[in-house]
């Protein structure tokens, strides 16, 4: 009788006006309960589900967006300072940031394996393993950092080999030298970030990043204008700012009582299965790297066009604007990855699917608004970065391509977040190879160089690759069997209990 009464009470609660139950929905009426309540009309279930999911999603997405915007803003502010030193310095900083983003993508991608595992383990209430995953991932990423350090030490001859102008290559290599210590900051930052996100802890990272941005802008102004350190001063301050974030983030994880169940101190268990974890994270790294490197290749190819300085400056400004809007989508990427992995770990297939489409729709609407703002301000937006009229005109001409890219980026990163939450990274990596590097870049090179459409031609081809990838991910997500995904998540976590969690 008690079970029957509870069911009746829950149905009555669901049928009440939303204003009466709004504060109780996330805690007392779970999303899965709403979506599976057959006694409710379909529209009512969707409406209640949207209200619950938007609260859960935005609570994760908004702080995550702020974190990514601030972190992206650190790189953009460095370009702004460089741009006001001169066009050559702007080109050098742009080529340096674009080149260094390769290791950023690698570390971010490998860190995404933590997001899958920690998210599903947290949803299944296996809290004690989260700290082990964090330590193991940090060790693996730090080891990967050593060969990357050697690679970037030889950035000058590599840039020359890629056909970049000698002056830009030399100044860009000096700029990169000042960024090299960031490699190991990334190794700690991304694993800790995913550890926090899996537990829906995002706001503290936003506060830390905001403090770092203020520190960076202040110190950069001092080193550039008061101390006259120029481009190298900009690079050194950027590195210091990243290490400030890492130090504050690490201190928070170790000392906060909210992680008493998930962080139990350093453990020798973290040294076990490093090679297995490396293989698992490699799939995540390939997926993310292929996505992030794709846009950076556009900037590198611009250095081979007829007027490389103008092309680099205009495209780097467009990419900076695109990166800012992209951070909004990446925030939803992080949120939906946590939501889907938590729901799959908890055994809630309908909630995982509902979260996927809710995040995709909201991110798409925001991206359309952003694209309209870019088109409306196309003649003025570039003056934030430069005072050169020729560069401003070139940016204005490229804004329609930028607007289309922003809209596509409103969908694609969210679907990639779903892939991370579900553990589809390897499959998506193959999709990225085909769409980006077999279709997008070759078509872009043909249009840009053979048909002489220059930067517009390269960008057109790359938009085509992104569109193809987005359509494929939409289809795969639509066709997914979410009950099977729950079972896969359960088996993956059972493997962890068998002490062989990373064996496929």
UniProtKB/Swiss-Prot annotation:
Main localization of the protein described in the UniProt heading: membrane
Localization of this protein: Membrane
Membrane topology reported for the UniProt record: Multi-pass membrane protein
Gene Ontology, cellular component aspect: membrane
Keywords (A to Z) from UniProt: Membrane, Transmembrane, Transmembrane helix, Transport
Top-level taxon: Eukaryota
GO MF terms, alphabetically ordered: antiporter activity; xenobiotic transmembrane transporter activity
Record field: transmembrane: 56-76, 90-110, 139-159, 170-190, 208-228, 234-254, 273-295, 316-336, 356-376, 401-421, 433-453, 457-477
GO BP term, pick one: xenobiotic detoxification by transmembrane export across the plasma membrane
Similarity comment: family membership: Belongs to the multi antimicrobial extrusion (MATE) (TC 2.A.66.1) family.
NCBIfam families linked to this entry: matE
Name listed for the protein in its UniProt record: Protein DETOXIFICATION 38
Species assigned in the record: Arabidopsis thaliana
């Amino acid at each position: 009788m008690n079970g029957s009464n509870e069911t009746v009470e829950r149905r009555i609660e669901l049928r009440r006006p939303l204003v009466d139950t709004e504060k109780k929905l996330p805690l007392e009426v779970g999303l899965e309960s709403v979506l599976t309540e057959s006694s409710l009309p379909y529209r009512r279930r969707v409406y209640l589900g949207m209200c619950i999911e938007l609260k859960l999603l935005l609570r994760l997405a908004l702080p995550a967006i702020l974190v990514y915007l601030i972190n992206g803003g650190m790189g953009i502010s460095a370009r702004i300072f460089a741009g006001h030193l001169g066009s050559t310095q702007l080109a050098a900083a742009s080529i340096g940031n674009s080149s260094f983003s390769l290791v950023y993508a690698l570390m971010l991608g490998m860190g995404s394996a933590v997001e899958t595992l920690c998210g599903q383990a947290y949803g299944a209430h296996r809290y004690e393993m989260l700290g082990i995953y964090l330590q193991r991932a940090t060790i693996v990423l730090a080891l990967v950092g050593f060969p990357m350090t050697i690679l970037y030490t030889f950035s000058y001859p590599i840039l020359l080999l890629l056909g970049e102008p000698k002056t830009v290559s030399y100044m860009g290599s000096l700029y990169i030298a000042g960024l090299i210590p960031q490699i190991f900051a990334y190794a700690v930052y991304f694993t800790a970030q995913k550890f926090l996100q899996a537990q829906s802890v995002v706001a503290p990272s936003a506060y830390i990043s905001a403090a770092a941005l203020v520190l960076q802008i202040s110190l950069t102004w001092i080193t550039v204008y008061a101390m006259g350190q120029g481009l190298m001063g900009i690079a050194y301050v950027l590195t210091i700012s990243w290490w400030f974030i890492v130090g504050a983030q690490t201190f928070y994880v170790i000392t906060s009582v909210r992680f008493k169940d998930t962080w139990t101190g350093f453990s020798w268990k973290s040294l076990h299965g490093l090679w297995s974890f490396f293989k698992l994270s490699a799939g995540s790294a390939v997926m993310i790297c292929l996505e992030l490197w794709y846009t950076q290749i556009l900037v590198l190819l611009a250095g081979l066009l007829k007027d490389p300085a103008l092309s680099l400056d205009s495209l780097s400004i467009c990419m900076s604007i695109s990166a800012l809007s992209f951070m909004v989508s990446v925030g939803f990427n992080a949120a939906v990855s946590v939501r889907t992995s938590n729901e799959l770990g908890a055994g809630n297939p309908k909630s995982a699917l509902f979260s996927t489409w809710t995040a995709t729709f909201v991110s798409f609407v925001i991206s359309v608004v952003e694209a309209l703002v870019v088109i409306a301000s196309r003649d003025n937006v570039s003056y934030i970065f430069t005072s050169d009229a020729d560069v401003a005109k070139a940016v204005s001409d490229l804004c329609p391509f930028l607007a289309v890219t922003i809209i596509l980026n409103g969908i694609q990163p969210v679907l990639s977040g779903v892939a991370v939450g579900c553990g589809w990274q390897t499959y998506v990596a193959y999709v990225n190879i085909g769409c980006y590097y077999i279709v997008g870049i070759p078509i872009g090179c043909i249009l840009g160089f053979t048909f002489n459409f220059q930067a517009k031609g390269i960008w057109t081809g790359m938009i085509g690759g992104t569109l193809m990838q987005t359509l494929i991910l939409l289809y795969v997500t639509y066709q997914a069997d979410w009950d099977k995904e729950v079972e896969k998540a359960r088996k993956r976590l059972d493997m962890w209990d068998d002490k062989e969690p990373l064996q496929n």
